[in-house]
Amino acid sequence: MAVNISKQPTRSFSLDEVTVRNELKLSQGFVMRKDLKGPRLIVTSGMGSTFSKCSLFIFKAVMILHTCLIVKSIRIFSKKKKRNGSMHNMYYASVPFLLFSNAYSIDFSRHVNEFLEKKRCEMIIPLKLLADHTYLSEIEYVSLNADGQYSQLQDIFFIHDVFFVYFRF
């Protein structure tokens, strides 16, 4: 659930005799909202803070390198070599490596996707907000996808897995 702060409507409501706006930017990453369940403080923690552009580039490079190594190994092992006067297909020698790489690839992408989902999940925890002498009973943690980096990472893993399965079979 991505939240776009700039496109949210602005309304007023009363909370503990204090009138606050529907969206009050308390500090960087903090936004006050009123929704169907009542007032909430939304803490937006973007993927940009967790995964910088440098680490995103490293992720891309690792996945591209991993895929290229798999394709290279398939090409090397699938070449027919002449042994004792007969053509011998070395493709079957690469099957254990392919199985290991397939398991590693799927397991690695699954763990990273689970980690990213945890970053995006909502956690409801009690909070006493001292500012404005208001008590907010709930705080909602939402990952702000400002740069679209989460979707880029998902696309990388999806392309990597599809590319690998295509060359695997």
UniProtKB/Swiss-Prot annotation:
Q: What species is this protein from?
A: Saccharomyces cerevisiae (strain ATCC 204508 / S288c) (Baker's yeast)
Q: Got a GO cellular component term for this one?
A: membrane
Please indicate which superkingdom the organism of origin belongs to.
Answer: Eukaryota
Other noteworthy facts: Partially overlaps PMT5.
Membrane topology listed for this record: Single-pass membrane protein
Q: Which UniProt keywords apply?
A: Membrane, Transmembrane, Transmembrane helix
Quote the protein name from its UniProt record: Putative uncharacterized protein YDL094C
Compartments (UniProt record): Membrane
Q: Where do the TM regions start and end?
A: 55-77
